[in-house]
Curated annotation (Swiss-Prot):
The keyword NADP applies. The gene is iolW. Its EC number is 1.1.1.371. Signal peptide: none annotated. The lineage of its organism: Bacteria, Bacillati, Bacillota, Bacilli, Bacillales. It holds the Pfam family GFO_IDH_MocA. GO terms for molecular function: NADP+ binding; NADPH binding; scyllo-inositol dehydrogenase (NADP+) activity. It comes from Bacillus subtilis (strain 168). This is scyllo-inositol 2-dehydrogenase (NADP(+)) IolW. Catalyzes the reversible NADPH-dependent reduction of scyllo-inosose (SIS) to scyllo-inositol (SI). Cannot use NADH instead of NADPH. May be involved in reduction of not only SIS but also various oxidized compounds manifested upon stressful conditions. Keywords: NADP, Oxidoreductase. One of its GO terms (biological process) is antibiotic biosynthetic process. It is an enzyme of class 1 (oxidoreductase).
């Protein structure tokens, strides 16, 4: 249910600075912060002055990081700059005593993430990673089925994140560089979801490559996370004209098959904001199918999806800052995603399974 929207009540407003105003800042962060009473977007560091004036006329456009880190009124900084700059920008904000939300992927390496976590702990500031797809309608539905016992004793968990982008685009995410490519960009989402459900695996076996002509970085990945009896298979390609199921989950007596993808991103890209209770609703044709076997009885039923809610992440961040509540995504969880990515790249390069230390 949508609550705490602008104008509903007065709160102790958290003044926010945003670093970067590309896709992430303008679509995934700005619109959510804008509708919640808890936040006020004070400054945005970007060269896209006209876009900010159009979208957030009350926000000040700045061009230097210090104009945000040196502002004592700003409590929270959202880091949405290119992934290779996350470490540098986040460390500067931490040292300035700011709470920080980092766009995923957290960092290029787990070592960088651990250094940031230590710095945040020493400074007494909060550090979280924006793994928003924990609040996709399909994933929330899967969590509900597991918690209710409708999916038990899972042996196979398979999730895909495919796109049809046969031509390499002139975007930093698709250029050779630090923390670029689809494993960092899209894979981090489904890795985080998997770790959120099952924790860290025993081992990782992966194939990571560039499939498209003229590709400069990874555009295909296939990971198997070994949990013993449970095997989690995560994959994504960039030349996929027609998608199969996004999720295929099999347990001892039940299976859940789900097509389609949460529509919050498309809605935000189209300029919509989450201002009513229809936000995050799934398309009925994409509702998942739960098949259950009890003895000789086999039943398949359609499961209406739980509404998605990216707003939940920022509601919880406000509660963490103002009330000391637990973070919705911890720095350690962000680091664990990078540990899996590093293991996957090592596995692919060396053509072997990488055992993980716990």
């Amino acid at each position: 249910m949508i609550t705490l929207l602008k104008g509903r009540r007065k709160v102790d407003t958290i003044k926010v600075g945003i670093l970067g105003y590309g896709l992430s800042g303008s679509v995934f962060h700005g619109p959510l912060l804008d509708v919640l009473d808890e936040y006020q977007i004070s400054k945005i560091m970007t060269s896209r002055t006209e876009e900010v004036k159009r979208d957030f006329p009350d926000a000040e456009v700045v061009h230097e990081l210090e104009e945000i880190t040196n502002d004592p009124a700003i409590e929270l900084v959202i880091v949405t700059t290119p992934s290779g700059l996350h470490y540098e920008h986040t460390m500067a904000c931490i040292q300035a005593g700011k709470h920080v939300v980092m766009e995923k992927p957290m960092t290029a390496t787990a070592e960088e993430g651990e250094t940031l976590k230590r710095a945040a702990d020493e400074k007494g500031v909060l550090l979280s990673v924006y793994h928003n797809r924990r609040w996709d309608n399909d994933f929330l539905t899967i969590k509900k089925l597991i918690s209710e016992g409708s999916l038990e004793d899972i042996n196979t968990y398979q999730v895909s994140y495919n796109r049809y982008r046969p031509e390499v685009q002139a975007r930093w995410r698709e250029k050779e560089g630090t923390a670029t490519g689809t494993l960092y960009d899209l894979g981090s989402h489904i890795i985080d979801q998997t770790l959120h459900l099952f924790g860290m695996p025993k081992a990782v076996t992966a194939n990571v490559m560039a499939q498209r002509e003229n590709a400069e970085t990874v555009d295909y990945f296939h990971l198997t996370l070994d949990y013993g009896k449970l095997q989690a298979i995560l994959y994504g390609g960039s030349i996929v004209p027609a998608n199969g199921p996004r999720y295929q989950i099999h347990g001892k007596d039940s299976s859940f098959i789900k097509y389609g993808i949460d529509g919050q991103e498309d809605a935000l890209r189209a300029g919509r904001k989450p201002e009513d209770d229809s936000w995050g609703a799934d398309v009925p044709e994409f509702y998942g199918k739960l098949t259950t076997i009890r003895g000789s009885d086999k039943k398949t039923e359609t499961i209406p999806s739980v509404n998605g809610s990216y707003l939940t992440y920022y509601r919880k961040i406000a509660e963490s800052i103002r009330e000391g509540a637990a973070l919705p995504v911890t720095a350690e969880e962000g680091i664990n995603v990078i540990r899996i990515i590093e293991a996957a790249m090592e596995s692919s390069k060396e053509k072997r399974t990488i055992m993980l230390e716990h």
